[in-house]
Amino acid sequence: MKKINAGNLFAGMRSSSVIAGLFIVLIVSIVLLFANFAYLNTQSNHDKQYIGHAGELRVLSQRIAKNATEAAAGKGEAFKLLKDARNDFEKRWNILVNGDESTSLPPSPEAVKPQMDVVQQDWDGLRKNADSILASEQTVLSLHQVASTLAETIPQLQVEYEEVVDILLENGAPADQVAVAQRQSLLAERILGSVNKVLAGDENSVQAADSFGRDASLFGRVLKGMQEGNAAMSISKVTNAEAVDRLNEIAELFEFVSGSVDEILETSPDLFQVREAANNIFSVSQTLLDKASQLADGFENLAGGRSINLFAGYALGALALASIILIGLVMVRETNRRLAETAEKNDRNQAAILRLLDEIADLADGDLTVAATVTEDFTGAIADSINYSIDQLRELVETINQTAVQVAAAAQETQSTAMHLAEASEHQAQEIAGASAAINEMAVSIDQVSANASESSAVAERSVAIANKGNEVVHNTITGMDNIREQIQDTSKRIKRLGESSQEIGDIVSLINDIADQTNILALNAAIQASMAGDAGRGFAVVADEVQRLAERSSAATKQIEALVKTIQTDTNEAVISMEQTTSEVVRGARLAQDAGVALEEIEKVSKTLAALIQNISNAARQQASSAGHISNTMNVIQEITSQTSAGTTATARSIGNLAKMASEMRNSVSGFKLPEGVEQA
């Protein structure tokens, strides 16, 4: 028997060494297989990144050409897109040249260096032109902004000049003035055409800029000649007021045109360079696209030139599979050997199990006095465990007997308590029903309070509206009094001027009275002289008497006028005093009305505050009514819960009675166990 075991031990050791060797071969082949595939996967990822960057270079080359053309045309957003495309191209190109640490991408292999060199040459030229366009961004945008403003201003100049021509024709202006005005409209059209040629940026842009400067200068000189006259240019000054106003408006519009001449002349060469750079980019972009495509093809051809490829991986996979098959064969042979040993061991264990079953056969009948024999076989531990279980079962049966007695006593006491709780729950349900009815009555009262508060709020709101209308009436009254005061002041001023005029009339009347007195004296002297002349002066004496009578009548009339003037002055002064008093009363009335307006505003504020408070009371009453309803519902729920509790307590009492019965049945169920002598039986 020992020789057989030693042979089995030697065979097991030899099988283990063979399996270990095969496992080593398997692990090495798997490691090499994964290393090969990892290398291929890494190189494949690198190739994908190279190809992706090369493909993006093709797209970016065309995007740069498109954005450069749009930037040269003056589109502001194109400059940002051009800059982004240029920077993106340079970033991706630097990654292809120097690698990318963030993605562990190495520089491009030497195999694609020829394609890289030709792309580098085209990129250097394209980048230089793109940088030139980006450096001129402000110049290009400013020039296009000026041109856009000119495109709006010059048509306005033409419209204004057409109106000037119409005005001159309607008023019969000289033909040379009309012809000059018409030429100005045509000259403005030519200025706009020159600006558009400058923006084109072709070989004629510099010449167009010079033409723009000359035409703008000529337009300004002719405009000034029409405003002020210019003999050297044979332009006469426009004198029609309406035409002069139009020329002044034209001069204001032309200030921007004349101010833009220098800027356009200075920046037009830069715009030509930008256009030339955009054209260069467009011509190079197609070549760069082709060369970038060749570079992408070069990256795609890298995989075929590597020394380690999929065939090596397949060979390592076959080696690993062969190792697995050999390991399986060795393990099958080892398993058969162990199965034979296990069969022999099972026979010995079967005999020990039968012996143990004979010893514990009485345990199935409830005899807890039996004990199993502990041997050195594997059943020894089982026998020891069975003996321990029998001891624990003895203690359990004893504990069940004691517990059943205690449970029966506790169940009877608990049943009595549950019945008392059921009676208390019924009484509590009756009290809750009464409280719920009282809460419902309180909710009805709160609803009535809420309705009264809502009505009071409506009354307060009407009070606010009335106060607001009263305030508007007071403001209208104040406005009317202010108008009356202004009219009274105007009337007072007119009456004062009437008094001053009457004073002047009085002065004139006094002068006439003095003249009448002097005329009377002169007539008297003439009569004396005529009487002294005798018959020769008789006719003159008659005239002198007539003059004297006229002087006396004039003196009497002037006295009457003087009396009337004094009466007018007196009435005027009284009217002025009355007007001033009326003005004072109007001012006082306006102040009183203003005070009334302030009082009404206070009433309005108080009414609004009162309305808000009443509204708050109404809201609070509604909330209380809602809360009362909620409390009522809660009380109903509590009443229902109490009813359920009462029913549950009654059911609990019945369950506790059943528990007492179950405790008795449990004592009966363990009464069949046989315990050693000296232990209390159930």
From Swiss-Prot:
Which keywords does this chain's UniProt record carry? Answer: Cell inner membrane, Cell membrane, Membrane, Methylation, Transducer, Transmembrane, Transmembrane helix
Presence of keyword RNA-binding: no
> Does the record carry Ribonucleoprotein as a key word?
no
Which SMART domains does UniProt cross-reference here?
MA (SM00283)
Q: State the membrane topology.
A: Multi-pass membrane protein
Domain Methyl-accepting transducer: where? 403-639
Cited SUPFAM superfamilies: Methyl-accepting chemotaxis protein (MCP) signaling domain (SSF58104)
Q: Which residues lie on this side of the membrane: Cytoplasmic?
A: 1-14, 334-682
Q: Which cysteines are joined by disulfide bonds?
A: none
Q: Which GO terms describe its molecular function?
A: transmembrane signaling receptor activity
Question: HAMP domain: from which residue to which, for each copy?
Answer: 347-398
Periplasmic face: residue ranges? 39-306
Major place of residence: membrane
Source domain of life: Bacteria
A single GO BP annotation from the record? chemotaxis
Q: Which family does it belong to?
A: Belongs to the methyl-accepting chemotaxis (MCP) protein family.
What protein name does the entry list?
Protein PilJ
Q: Gene of origin?
A: pilJ
